[in-house]
Amino acid sequence: MSESRAGDMIGRRRFVAGAVAAGFTGSAWANFPSVASDDIAVWHNETELVSPVVYGQYMKDGGTRGFACLEKLEKAFEKVMREVKDTKVDGIPAVWSVYNMGYVIKTRKSLFSIDLVHRRDMEFAAMLDFALVTHNHGDHYRKDLCRAIAGRRKPVISNFIPVRGYTRAKKTFKIRDVEIRTSLIDHNDWLIDFTTAFEIKVGNWSLYHTGDSGRGTEPKLETAWGRPDLWLFFPGCGIDTVKAVAKIKAKRIVFGHLWELGHRQNHRGRLDEPLLRRALANAAKGGCKNTSLAFWGDRIV
């Protein structure tokens, strides 16, 4: 066994041992064949090699510079694009993780995005029926993509972009076969009512996406349509994960903001292995036994 491979194996064992010791028994990977304990240390080690400066250069010129995680980010986009085109939806929507808190969702009649950010995201501009943006931070939206969608007279629902779809109120939109309910939550202690939480319903199936949510915002979390089937959740920015999970009672939680490359290492906006282990354990304490991860390019539903 090579030295690097041995190091990865040790890292993975430490992750699993720590999760079990924290009361997390491994159900996090039940629905994610590609997100097994064997993958955690590999992704962690690969992303640690890429600084925010290198990531910024990649976003400008597309050069992966031999970094494995940037090559994976390119392949993830290609995988999502291919599967979106090839997938026919008859019932429950199909949901893909692209990067960070960015997702693409396909229903029987619609294709839309939430917080889509990728170097090549403009390739989706002509395909999307609408876009949802939780807040005004560069790791959650791209100006060119939003302009392109709005320029096609399609809604961009946000609390800050002055185009069709702008709102800072509690409001329900109906677009094709999708209902979207908006409400404001806090990003952190000083960005109050900065993030739009989206409650999304397609038929009898519902999704909750809370963007970046901070300490003390738990009372503002609300799901008028009952327990969401899926909650796309970032357990960072100071939110009390145990309280939030106990309140929302989602049937399934998938963590996002994994290894966001625009944040420096060990930043709480970069959900990496130490934060991840605590968050998984806290979700279990909050009562959700179906909590998992989605890496870039993974199909979630």
Task: Write out the residue ranges for each language-model feature.
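Metallo-beta-lactamase
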Residues: 2, 7-10, 16-98, 103-130, ...
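Short, P/G- and charge-enriched loop/turn segments at secondary-structure junctions
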Residues: 90-93, 183-188
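Residue-level marker for the onset of beta-strands and adjacent loop->beta junctions
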Residues: 91, 101, 169, 194-196
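Active-site-proximal loop/helix segments of hydrolase catalytic cores
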Residues: 117, 186-249
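Extracellular/periplasmic catalytic domains that process cell-envelope and extracellular macromolecules
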Residues: 124-125, 150, 174, 191-192, ...
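Hydrophobic/aromatic beta-strand patches that form the interior of the parallel beta-sheet core
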Residues: 132, 157, 181, 232, ...
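Detector for the c-type heme attachment site
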Residues: 135-137
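Binuclear metal-ion centers of metallo-dependent hydrolases, dominated by the metallo-beta-lactamase
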Residues: 166-181, 192-193, 222, 246-301
